[in-house]
Design a protein with these regions (language model features):
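Expand to "…catalyze enediolate/carbanion chemistry for C-C bond making/breaking, isomerization
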Residues: 1-116
């Protein structure tokens, strides 16, 4: 994802449920990124962890000469507005996500909370 953006090329990503079968389907894809959609599903850290592991194609990483996985994993966390649920983002990053997609952030206070 970063390589495409640094070279000025468009980066393409897809959305998928945080399930190992979806991760396996996308592991060898040509997408630059994959967003695991965790906003509209019950939060399941074990399923997310397994999905992040199944997404890694270690041979592809080795052959690329960089430690950056392709597709780069992101997680769309549950709403972070009034609930102030940063713990979802922290847990997703701890499990191996490379980035967070914050839904429904519409006020400055919510944006500050998201990056606090």
């Amino acid at each position: 994802m970063i390589g495409a953006l640094e070279s000025g090329k468009p980066a393409f990503a897809a959305f998928a449920p945080p399930e190992p079968s979806a991760a396996l389907d996308f592991a060898g894809s040509a997408y630059d990124g994959l967003v695991f959609e965790a906003e509209h599903k019950p939060w399941d850290a074990v399923n997310l962890r397994d999905s992040l592991q199944y997404l890694l194609d270690r041979r592809r990483i080795f052959e690329s000469g960089t430690l950056a996985p392709s597709p780069t994993p992101f997680v769309r966390v549950p709403v972070n507005g009034a609930e102030q649920g940063q713990w979802h983002a922290k847990q997703a990053l701890d499990l191996g996500a490379y980035g967070i997609v914050w839904p429904h952030v519409s006020r400055v206070e919510e944006a500050r909370n998201a990056v606090a």
